[in-house]
Amino acid sequence: MARVTVEDCLEHVENRFDLVLKAAKRAHILELGGAEPMVPRDNDKPAVLALREIAAGYDVTREGQEQETEEVDVGRNVLAETAKMNKAVASQKESEV
């Protein structure tokens, strides 16, 4: 398990804020199983894996985007169905009164 430094990562991202956002997003994808790590796992947690990938120069923004798009679409569908159900329940209650 190699140590990852901020300086190693900053060679591949513009600033610390961008590093935090990219690493957090990638760690979330890794944790959900939306993508395989691009570096050896070595018993590291997803956040460390994400930082190691960035330090190694991998483009972590591309990996897992398809999975994220699917999750957003599913979320929208769930919201739409919930809204329809709420509207139906409200209509039923109005007709009972």
From Swiss-Prot:
GO terms for biological process: DNA-templated transcription. InterPro entries: DNA-dir_RNA_pol_omega, Pol_omega/Rpo6/RPB6, RPB6/omega-like_sf. It holds the Pfam family RNA_pol_Rpb6. One of its GO terms (molecular function) is DNA binding. Keywords: DNA-directed RNA polymerase, Nucleotidyltransferase, Transcription, Transferase. Its EC number is 2.7.7.6. SMART domains: RNA_pol_Rpb6. It catalyses: RNA(n) + a ribonucleoside 5'-triphosphate = RNA(n+1) + diphosphate. GO terms for cellular component: DNA-directed RNA polymerase complex. Belongs to the RNA polymerase subunit omega family. Promotes RNA polymerase assembly. Latches the N- and C-terminal regions of the beta' subunit thereby facilitating its interaction with the beta and alpha subunits. The RNAP catalytic core consists of 2 alpha, 1 beta, 1 beta' and 1 omega subunit. When a sigma factor is associated with the core the holoenzyme is formed, which can initiate transcription. NCBIfam families: rpoZ (TIGR00690). This is DNA-directed RNA polymerase subunit omega.
